[in-house]
Regions:
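A helix-coil-helix interface module used to build multimeric assemblies
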Residues: 2-215, 219-223
């Protein structure tokens, strides 16, 4: 059955599909796969900054080529990973195998066993998802909220001189101005934006039980 607004699993992808389309780049399955690729790549690059003998000869000039794997991530790449998953029956492992194939293509096969080294799947997932939320907030959600605040402030100035009936305890009370009441909402939203900016985007990294066990066994000299 083809996806349409009537058989989508929720109104987010159904009735409101046209309104939520900008969020597909962050919350679709393809987006999640891309973020997993990004985490794996950046983790490998981070490993190269440590005194690991097997990675000392890795050319740092290749970091740009590695980052292009997620910066230029395509629907075809996502499909290739889904095809691998048909064999692995494991979504994160499919990403790992995809990257190993890409390392082969780039001529750096000697280093591919350090992809996903010492990690568990949730290290990747619990970093990819918070990063996607952070990017969505900064790229789409917050700018839209800012537009709403600007519109409210414009309306507040436009209607600042218009008197209106006000109430307290459900009874008629001293009058107010329409512009002032609109400004109340813009101020409330700005306060919430300040709180939104302070929300931490925590991630989880540490191996199967969070103790970096595999890392410590393999390289006990590295803290």
């Amino acid at each position: 059955m083809l996806l349409n607004t009537l058989n989508a699993i929720s109104p987010v992808d159904g009735r409101y599909r046209s309104k939520t389309k900008p969020l597909y780049a962050f919350f679709s399955e393809q987006a999640l796969i891309k973020y997993r690729v990004q985490i794996e790549i950046e983790y490998f690059i981070a490993l190269c900054s440590h005194p690991i003998p097997q990675l000392e000869s890795f050319q740092h000039s290749l970091f740009e080529d590695l980052r292009s794997l997620y910066e230029q991530f395509s629907p075809e790449d996502a499909k290739a990973i889904k095809d691998i998953e048909k064999t692995t029956n494991h979504d994160v492992k499919a990403v790992e195998y995809f990257l190993k194939n890409e390392f082969d293509r780039l001529g750096i096969s000697d280093y591919k066993e350090f992809i996903h080294f010492g990690l568990t799947s949730q290290d990747v997932n619990n970093t990819a998802v918070p990063l996607s939320i952070k990017d969505a907030v900064e790229t789409v959600i917050r700018p839209e909220i800012e537009k709403t605040v600007l519109l409210l402030e414009k309306m507040a100035a436009q209607y600042d001189h218009i008197p209106m009936l006000a109430r307290t305890h459900g009874q008629v009370a001293s009058p107010t101005r329409l512009g002032k009441e609109i400004r109340v909402f813009s101020e409330r939203i700005k306060q919430q934006m300040t709180l939104l900016d302070q929300v931490p985007h925590a991630a989880k990294f540490g191996g199967a039980t969070g103790n970096f066990n595999a890392h410590q066994v393999a390289y006990p000299q590295i803290d």
